[in-house]
């Protein structure tokens, strides 16, 4: 999971801390959420906010977050919740990069290489275990 949105209530501290971050702002998050959910939808519904759902029995997860991202704490909280539910979850928070860094490998080459290596290693490991 790369910078996952797991809480449509937008109650994570990083939503405020990085409200004016490059690429993804709090304002754009509110716009996206409101268009997606429409009026009257429960923002804690696990179908849109998996952080509030049952997590036991889910497959192992790699959660990658960006330090300068309003969604950073969503990912951190989700990884912690998965672990608390007995799910194998690994978390990496990439420092000094914004949301979207994985799509911009030239913006922070060393971070991009590390992200891609970690992701490929985890996928390879999961496929080896499954097959």
Which role does the model predict for each range below?
Residues 1-131:
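Alpha/beta-hydrolase superfamily serine-hydrolase fold, recognizing
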């Amino acid at each position: 999971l790369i910078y996952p949105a797991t809480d449509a209530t937008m109650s994570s501290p990083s939503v405020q801390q990085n409200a004016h971050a490059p690429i993804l702002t709090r304002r754009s998050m509110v716009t996206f959420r409101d268009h997606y959910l429409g009026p009257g939808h429960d923002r804690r519904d696990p179908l849109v906010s998996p952080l509030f759902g049952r997590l036991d029995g889910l497959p192992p997860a790699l959660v990658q977050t960006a330090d300068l991202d309003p969604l950073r704490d969503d990912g951190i909280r989700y990884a912690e919740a998965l672990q608390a539910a007995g799910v194998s979850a690994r978390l990496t928070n990439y420092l000094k990069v914004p949301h979207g860094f994985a799509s911009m490998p030239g913006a922070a080459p060393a971070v991009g290489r590390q992200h891609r290596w970690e992701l490929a290693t985890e996928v390879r490991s999961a496929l080896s275990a499954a097959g």
